[in-house]
């Protein structure tokens, strides 16, 4: 495998022109889009317009004149088309944590006689914290049951009310079989909430086709919505009017500007809204999503797998002396869009990589994690990144005090 071969891959890449849509610092190979996507070039202009023209000149009339009030539904629809959702089944709102709390709280109320919430030890800890917090509020015998990721489909029993599952493991990149787990859960009357934080924008998701009923996700990773961008939630049309919102805010009221003293939930997905939307952040996301208008997600998936295979092969060719252990060891259909390696000095190596312009991230206790984001990554990027990884490990340039000092964010 040589640079000529790599160059040919890039020349034949059907997605290569999309790289131009992003602000990518010179000399940086950005392999952390699974944590924070880069800035789409179209976003600053939209933010300037919203701030200077809409807020600055139109003031409060912008809620009508510039359709601020419909942003949660409009942005939700754009996301919905990317995750295989039915029309009017997704809204953009709040954070993933808040949306998980909303759907989880509403779901356990649908099956009050069941007291178990199921999740797995590979789930993102934040989701487990939300579950634990809700259980403290519920009391009355509720429990969180944790199992190994590979055991989920085998432990679905009729005392379980809800299962909370992140489709792609944030550390290893393992991808659960949404269709299989959802079908088996339904056989036992279990509601499943799918966390799509590492799925949306990474590969084609088919919520409707898989039979999924409930989902949440963020927009600042593969969707490139920006730091702290608003999240989204999905409820299948069949369940929408059964959901009783635990956070009954005015944006979820059937007529918010009637100012009724009593809460009456809106019909459909809108009842899951709560407070006033963050217009500036949601407008940025709205524009960021336009990057995907002419993108075939199946091509994204195909390139992602090729990037993975190239990365894995190049690391393997370095030999065992690197002490890097591949953690994403699953078949293609069971992988997300990242590649992870374990190394005893993973944190220091990652800091040295970042210092050399190869930006990935570290996840405790020893995981070097690299996001594979086909819209702006080239095959040459992967080739060069592995060259730098090899140099850092072979020269032990990672073994400097500055690379061992832990930052607040890893």
Give the predicted meaning of each segment:
Residues 1-410:
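Pyridoxal 5′-phosphate
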């Amino acid at each position: 495998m040589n640079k000529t071969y790599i160059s040919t891959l890039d020349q034949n890449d059907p997605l290569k022109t999309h790289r131009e849509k992003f602000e990518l610092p010179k000399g940086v190979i950005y392999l952390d889009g699974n944590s924070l996507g880069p800035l789409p070039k179209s976003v600053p202009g939209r933010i300037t317009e919203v701030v200077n023209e809409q807020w600055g000149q139109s003031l409060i009339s912008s809620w009508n004149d510039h359709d601020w009030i419909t942003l949660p539904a409009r942005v939700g629809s754009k996301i919905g088309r990317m995750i295989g959702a039915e029309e009017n089944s997704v809204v953009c709102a709040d954070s993933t944590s808040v949306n998980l709390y909303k759907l989880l709280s509403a779901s356990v109320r649908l099956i009050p006689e069941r007291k178990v919430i199921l999740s797995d030890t590979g789930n993102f800890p934040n989701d487990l914290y939300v579950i634990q917090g809700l259980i403290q509020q519920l009391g009355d015998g509720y429990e969180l049951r944790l199992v190994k990721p590979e055991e989920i489909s085998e432990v679905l029993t009729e005392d379980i009310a809800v299962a909370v599952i992140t489709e792609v493991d944030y550390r290893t990149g393992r991808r659960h079989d949404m269709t299989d787990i959802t079908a088996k859960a339904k056989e036992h009357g279990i509601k499943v909430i799918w966390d799509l934080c590492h799925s949306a924008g990474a590969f084609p998701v088919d919520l409707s086709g898989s039979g999924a009923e409930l989902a949440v996700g963020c927009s600042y990773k593969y969707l490139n919505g920006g730091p702290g961008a608003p999240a989204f939630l999905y409820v299948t049309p069949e369940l929408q009017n059964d959901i009783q919102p635990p956070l009954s805010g005015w944006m979820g009221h059937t007529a918010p500007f009637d100012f009724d003293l009593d809460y009456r939930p809106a019909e459909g997905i809108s009842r899951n809204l709560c407070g006033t939307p963050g217009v500036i952040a949601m407008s940025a996301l709205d524009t960021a999503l336009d990057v995907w208008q002419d993108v075939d997600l199946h091509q994204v998936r195909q390139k992602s797998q090729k990037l993975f295979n190239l990365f894995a092969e190049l690391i393997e060719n370095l030999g065992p002396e690197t002490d890097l252990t591949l953690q994403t060891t699953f078949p293609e259909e069971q992988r997300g869009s990242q590649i992870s390696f374990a190394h005893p000095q993973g944190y220091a190596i990652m800091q040295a990589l970042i210092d050399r312009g190869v930006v990935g991230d570290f996840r405790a206790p020893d995981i070097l994690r690299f996001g594979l984001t086909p819209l702006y990554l080239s095959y040459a990027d992967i080739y060069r990144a592995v060259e730098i990884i090899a140099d850092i490990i072979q020269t032990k340039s990672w073994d400097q005090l500055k690379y061992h000092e832990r930052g607040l964010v890893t």
